[in-house]
Structures are given as structure tokens and as C-alpha cells.
Amino acid sequence: MKVFVTGATGYIGGSVSTRLLEQGHEVIGLARSAEAAVALKKRGIEPLTGDINAYTPFVEVVKRVDAVINAANSDNAFVAHALLTGLRGTGKTLIQTSGSSVVGTYDNGEASDDTFDEDTPFTPQPEKAMRVAIDHAVLAAAKENVRAIVIRPALIYGRGIGVSSTSVQLPKLIDVARKHGVPRHVGRGLNIWGHVHIEDVAALYLLALEKASAGSLFYAENGEASFKSVTQSLGRMLGMGDRTQDWPIGEAVEGLGPGAYLSFGSNSRVRAKRSRALGWQPKGRALTDEIENGVYAEVYGRK
């Protein structure tokens, strides 16, 4: 199978691309610079050099491939529109990357008992409304002969196996701990997020590519933890002990940007019911073990 991957130099897209190549698939990857094109070529990926917002190349490249994986920007409606324009009526596959933050609410570090599987309705917060609208537009394309699939990973951790090996949320918390001399969490840190290893995320993409029906939505999670427990684990890895510090939401927004509300202060407790029903069996290293004894200890731990 020939697959076009946007975000092929990124954390998710790069890891998925590596697994696709290992399974014998051909991969075309979007490269936004000459350096990115070289990096993709070195990995056996055919680079398509261009801008993420270039409409015509996206419409044209889908004619050359059997499937598309959009892992570049979950909030970019333009990209989704361009890909769907080229895919409608073809029966080809589009896997759209979303994220479990869409179910988050403004909890400011407090706990919530609410959990969500793929069938649980919810109303997104305003900053996630566009992402959910894109997800719905992709899934609706199943009625227009597109094998449309959406995957919503929880907090992803672990070493990426593509061009980019670095996760997103945890390194930001590590930077905060180093800056202030103590790990910090939004509010009391009682808010809970699901999490999933990057290798398990890549495995779900390949499984969905092989088996999923048109119109399928999948969460990706393999456990959950409060941000207080996550920051305690980071503190132990950094040699700071178990002590953590509450971070008022206003100060957290100043330090982390608006993402502090939903990426670090909300609850995102999802259940990957449909993913497991499809046959997904996550096997990645546990979150605390990866932090304290794995890649994060190797890269960020005390020397």
C-alpha cells in the first residue's frame, strides 16, 4: 500500500511512518523544508516538499496513494478540506489525528469522575470546537465513499521512532520543574488524564488502516494518572524528590500559554473501548517507568 503522511517529520506521523515502512508499505511524507526532505529520504520516505496550507498538492497527491494519514495539525480545517476534496468518491482511506483534550473542561487542577468512550456524547470547550467539527466532517465523509477514520490519543509519552523522538506535554512540565526548582501542576494537580505509549499509538494507526470500518472513531489510552502523580514521578527522575507545588491557573497560563487550561489543568479520562474491540493490545512501557527509568531519565535525568 502507498500512504501519504502529513506530519511525517513529527512525533506521531514519524512513528507511524516508520512502522508503515517496516510493514512493507511505501510512504510519501510532507516536508516543509529542504532539511525535512533530506531527513525523510534518509528514512526511505519519499518527500513531498510544500506548505501545509498548499491546496493543490494535497488534492493531487491523493490520486497517487491508497491511503492518507493526517498527523500534521488537528485544528487545521483547510488541510482536512483539501484532503477530503481529493478523496471523496474514491473509497480510499483517510485517518485523521485528533486528541482526547476535546473532552476536557476548565477544571483548573481539580478532579472529575466523568469518563468518555467513543460513544459518550460531550460538548467541547470553545478552543476545541474547531477540532471536533473537523473530526465530524471527516467521519461524515464515510457517506461519500471515503474510508474515514478518526483517532484521538490521550497524553502520549515515550521515545518516538521517527524523525522526531520527543513528546509534547511531559517535556514542558520538565522545563517548568527546572525553571522553578520544583515540579508544578495546575492547581492541586488532582485532575486526571489518560495516557498511551507512542509505540502503541503507532500500532493502533496500522491496525485501523488494516481493519477499521469507514466512519470509525477510536480513543487511544492505556491507563490514567493525576497530574500530581505525574509531576511527582518527574521530580524523582530529576532528583527533586516527591515534593510538588500547586500552580495557580493564572500563573500557569503565563508559563505555559493558553494550553494550560485544557492540556494541563483539565480532566481527560477516556476509554478506548472500540480500539480494544478492533484487536488493539497496548504493550508499551508504563508511564512512571518510562519517566523514571526510560527515555526521560536518559535525556533529562540527573547526570
Regions found by a protein language model. Name each.
Residues 136-161:
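Conserved beta-loop-beta element that borders a ligand/cofactor-binding pocket
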Residues 172-196, 204:
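A conserved pocket-lining segment of Rossmann-fold NAD(P)-dependent short-chain dehydrogenase/reductase
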Residues 204-259, 299-302:
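Mid/C-terminal beta-alpha module of Rossmann-like enzyme folds, strongest
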